[in-house]
Structures are given as structure tokens and as C-alpha cells.
Amino acid sequence: PVIDGEPIYEEIPHGLHDENELRWKDHDVRRYAYWSVFAGSFGHTYGNNSIMQFLKPGVTGAYGAKKPWQEAMNDPGFNQMKYLKNLMLTFPFFIRVPDQTNIAGTNGERYDRAIATRGDDYLLVYNYTGRPMQIDLRKISGTRKSAWWYTAKDGKLEYIGTFDNGIHEFQHHSGYNSGNDHVLIVTDS
């Protein structure tokens, strides 16, 4: 088993040492968490600039950290990790495998890349940007499939419909934007 023990940190500068650079945000830490777990790791370590330093008032933080670590525990990414945990605990762990063959056609590059994991009767596909995806529903049991969107930032579930086996295009109605991340959930009907 593997774990990503040090991915990016929420609110740390992209270039690490230049505090004037853009900072990694909640959608960035979610991306690394979902990519890691859907690729087959047994877990993920959340990181936050202020929390990792246990930054206290009156102390100058490294990497541009400004807020006390207790306050950083209210940052969005910190509180959004529970939605990944809840999703993964909903489905059997020991039969789940990473399976990119569920993604038909071109998968995309860099942040546009979708990642899939499945069990015998369910399929989960994480999409960071909301781009259209061609998904092969024949890899899990059943001739009819039920599908939902799961919103990574708040855990909301939205029923999409029932589909026959085959390849279908899915795109979340909120459009194609970086950080517009959702999980397509498909189960045997």
C-alpha cells in the first residue's frame, strides 16, 4: 500500500519560497487527494501552510504563513477532506481497483485528466475541471446503471438518471472550469 504523505499545502505559495506567488487553494488540495485515493493509495495527508508550522500569534511564519494554526483549521480544504472520506467509506474498499479503461477516448492532460476507480458493481470517476468525459459503463455489473454527481467541495449528491450499458458522455451542468471538481458515481441498477 502507498500513501501520498506530502502533497501540496493549502495556502502555501506555488513556488514555496516566494510569498508573492499564487497560493494553493482548497480545490488544489482536493485534486491531489482524489487523484491519490482513486489511483489506489490507501489514504492521503492533508497539508496546510499554517497548520504544518503550528503558527502562533506573534511568531513570523515561513512561506508567507500569516494566520494561527487554529484559525487555519477553518480553511475550506481542511473541512472538505471529510467528503472524500465519506465517499470512499460508502463503497467496499477491498474490491476497489484503479481502472482508467473506464474512460473512453481521449482522457486529457494535466489538470484535465479524469481518474477512475471501480468495484464489481460501482464506478467512481473524478473530474477536476468539469470537462466532458466519455465513460464506458460496461466495466461494472448490470445492464442498466444509475448515475449521480457528487460535488467534491460540499458532498452534495445529484441524481443524473439511468443509463444502458455502453459508452456515454457525462459533463456536469456547471460547466468546464478549473476547480469545478465532481465525482461521477455509477452503480448497477
Residue ranges with predicted function:
Residues P1-H27:
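Active-site clefts of carbohydrate-active enzymes
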